[in-house]
Amino acid sequence: MAEDQAPREETVEAPELTEAPEIDELETLRAERDELRDRFMRALADAENSRKRADRDRREAEQYGGTRLARDLLPVYDNLSRALEVATDEQRAAAAALIEGVELTLRELRNVMNKHGVRPITPQVGDTFDPQQHQAMFEAPVPGTKAGQIIQVMTEGFMIHDRLLRPAQVGVSSNTGA
């Protein structure tokens, strides 16, 4: 009987020795699984971020892609506006069709610019200077005005959607009191 018991004890001990390497292997596989899961989740997050970035870039390209063209058209707008401002009543009467053509061209240019999100910034004399939308071309003391008030508007400014395309050029009062 002693002989029967001895081999059984050895057999019992042998599985315990083989279980330890299996446990180590199981832990290794779990760690590898966790690492792969983490890498997979990071890859998913990167893909989602890339998709969002591409969507944002596409939207910005749609909104602001014509910025350079719009900026190049602003002198045309300015010149048409100036031509109408300086035309005297006699010139308007003598060249009514020409003046009407310039007015229609300017109106159409405004409509096209508006359609593409280009909007004028039209400060008025007496408004407060806003450095986000205005460019001070000069400062001068003017009686009856406060420092920082607009005293002259030289050119309109323009926004394209929510971005400044060109600041309005203005003269600003430098008075320290009212």
From Swiss-Prot:
Chain intervals for the UniProt region annotation (Disordered): 1-30
GO (cellular component) term, any one: cytoplasm
Signal peptide, first to last residue: none
GO biological process terms, semicolon-separated: protein folding
GO MF assignments: adenyl-nucleotide exchange factor activity; protein homodimerization activity; protein-folding chaperone binding; unfolded protein binding
Keywords associated with the record: Chaperone, Cytoplasm, Stress response
Record field: compositional bias (Basic and acidic residues): 1-11
Gene3D superfamilies, per database record: 3.90.20.20, Head domain of nucleotide exchange factor GrpE
Location within or outside the cell: Cytoplasm
Task of the protein: Participates actively in the response to hyperosmotic and heat shock by preventing the aggregation of stress-denatured proteins, in association with DnaK and GrpE. It is the nucleotide exchange factor for DnaK and may function as a thermosensor. Unfolded proteins bind initially to DnaJ; upon interaction with the DnaJ-bound protein, DnaK hydrolyzes its bound ATP, resulting in the formation of a stable complex. GrpE releases ADP from DnaK; ATP binding to DnaK triggers the release of the substrate protein, thus completing the reaction cycle.
Subunit annotation: Homodimer.
Family statement drawn from the similarity comment of this UniProt entry: Belongs to the GrpE family.
Name used for this protein in its record: Protein GrpE
Organism: Cereibacter sphaeroides (strain ATCC 17023 / DSM 158 / JCM 6121 / CCUG 31486 / LMG 2827 / NBRC 12203 / NCIMB 8253 / ATH 2.4.1.) (Rhodobacter sphaeroides)
Lineage: Bacteria, Pseudomonadati, Pseudomonadota, Alphaproteobacteria, Rhodobacterales
UniProt gene name: grpE
